[in-house]
């Protein structure tokens, strides 16, 4: 069975393999490690242990372990001769019976930054294809005349998806001149002729490439266009061919009357009734232009999911999950250069380079560390690791959420994909 282990001083791949009954090669592969590099104190690794033995880690509880392994809490306590309120001790050995995995859907977004698409990004897409229900190609940009600006090499990306029995998603955005545009959206929503032409172009494009989900990521929509957006989605839904689905992106809200231009036009209840599923952007509490903090802290993520559940069936909700972290320069000041995006693998490499331990915030359920660079400038890094994504998987189970959506492909995080299939059965529809 797979378990998450936190590296302590003196640990090595070989010592951990010996302790947990795994092999060095397996630990290296599952965690995307370079065998020549040392481990970092505080680094989280996934280790395939012998049989059904589990060794308690910092922050563990019977409830958390039962969630992780899909085993009823009472059964876990009984088989280990423990009460439901037993205090666990780090290193304590437990027996964990085999659990039952729930089926979920998964999405990953692909956003090429070059023409042609870098081969490394194409290879990364192929590598995670087995873990996906949908591949979201970001993005087809809406135009004021009802046409679409198409991204590069669409046919190639759609073929990669279908070869892996993954459904390619046609992601349409209201991006104009590099930004989400309320004015552009208003033109499409308020002019019936342009809107009908727009929908026709979308459906023709979807059928041309075999993109069987039509997805609208319309952000910064004017609050006064809320009902017009709902009507537009109903219009699209009535024109969908058989076998096609409709989905949308929702900004993270915690109430129906939440104010602000980013929130008001996204009607959770109406969209939950109209579309087949929604992608909830449950990330970016820590963002490039803000102060250092966890990108997707577990508490705020849970609040958004609970509100979403009150407005629509939980099976329609896809929880957003970042594959990136950020590296901020300190002290933080408004107007500073934006924080640098960083992958999980690159974050651990930074901690190794500057010989600093990785800490873990159990409240936010997120890893972080600080370091001084060669110029004496202090940095603060928040990112994702196996512990943080496992906490999100447990939240999905607790809330009965229908799936998960990743932003974005090209940020290496091998632990995530191994843990995803350890926790869930991924639905394939292609």
Curated annotation (Swiss-Prot):
One cellular-component annotation, GO: endomembrane system
Keywords: Germination, Glycosidase, Hydrolase, Repeat
Chain ranges of the GH18 domain: 104-430
Group of enzyme by EC: hydrolase
Alphabetized SUPFAM superfamilies for the sequence: (Trans)glycosidases, LysM domain
Single GO term (MF): chitin binding
pH-dependence annotation: Optimum pH is 6.0.
Pfam families named among the record's database cross-references: Glyco_hydro_18, LysM
InterPro entries the record matches: CFLE_GH18, Chitinase_II/V-like_cat, Chitinase_insertion_sf, Glyco_hydro18_cat, Glycoside_hydrolase_SF, LysM_dom, LysM_dom_sf
The family this protein is said to belong to: Belongs to the glycosyl hydrolase 18 family. Chitinase class II subfamily.
Protein name: Cortical fragment-lytic enzyme
Species for this entry: Bacillus cereus
Biological classification of the source: Bacteria, Bacillati, Bacillota, Bacilli, Bacillales
Name of the gene: sleL
């Amino acid at each position: 069975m797979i378990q998450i282990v936190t590296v302590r001083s003196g640990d090595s791949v070989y010592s951990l393999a010996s302790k947990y009954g795994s092999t060095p090669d397996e630990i290296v592969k599952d965690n995307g490690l370079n065998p020549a590099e040392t481990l970092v104190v505080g680094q989280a690794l996934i280790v395939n242990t012998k049989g059904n033995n589990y060794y308690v880690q910092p922050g563990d509880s019977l409830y958390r372990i039962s969630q992780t392994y899909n085993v009823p809490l009472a059964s876990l306590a009984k088989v280990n001769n423990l009460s439901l309120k037993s205090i666990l001790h780090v290193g304590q050995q437990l027996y964990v019976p085999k659990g039952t995995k729930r089926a979920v859907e998964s999405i990953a977004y692909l956003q090429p930054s070059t023409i042609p698409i870098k081969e490394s990004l194409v290879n990364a897409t192929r590598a995670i294809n087995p873990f996906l229900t949908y591949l979201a190609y970001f993005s087809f940009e809406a135009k004021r005349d009802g046409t679409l600006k198409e991204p590069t090499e669409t046919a190639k990306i759609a073929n990669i998806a279908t070869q892996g029995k993954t459904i390619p998603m046609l992601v349409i955005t209201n991006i104009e001149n590099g930004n989400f545009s309320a004015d552009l959206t208003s033109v499409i929503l308020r002019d019936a002729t342009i809107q009908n032409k727009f929908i026709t172009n979308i459906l023709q494009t979807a059928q041309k490439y075999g993109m069987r989900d039509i997805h609208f990521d319309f952000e910064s929509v004017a609050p006064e266009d809320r009902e017009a957006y709902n009507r537009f989605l109903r219009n699209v839904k009535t024109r969908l061919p058989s076998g096609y689905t409709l989905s949308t992106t929702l900004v993270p809200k915690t109430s129906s009357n939440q104010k602000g231009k980013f929130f008001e036009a996204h009607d959770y209840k109406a969209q939950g009734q109209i579309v087949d599923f929604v992608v909830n952007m449950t990330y970016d509490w820590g963002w490039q232009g803000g102060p250092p903090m966890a990108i997707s802290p577990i508490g705020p993520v849970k609040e958004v999911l609970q509100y979403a559940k009150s407005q629509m069936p939980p099976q329609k909700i896809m929880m957003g999950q970042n594959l990136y972290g950020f590296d901020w320069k300190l002290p933080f000041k408004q107007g500073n250069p934006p924080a640098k995006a960083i992958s999980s693998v690159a974050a651990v490499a930074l901690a190794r380079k500057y010989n600093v331990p990785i800490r873990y915030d159990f409240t936010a359920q997120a890893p972080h560390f600080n370091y001084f660079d060669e110029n004496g400038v202090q940095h603060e890094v928040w990112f994702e690791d196996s512990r943080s994504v496992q906490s999100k998987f447990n939240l999905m189970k607790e809330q009965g959420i229908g799936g998960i959506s990743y932003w974005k492909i090209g940020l290496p995080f091998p632990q995530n994909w191994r843990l995803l299939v350890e926790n869930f059965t991924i639905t394939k529809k292609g």
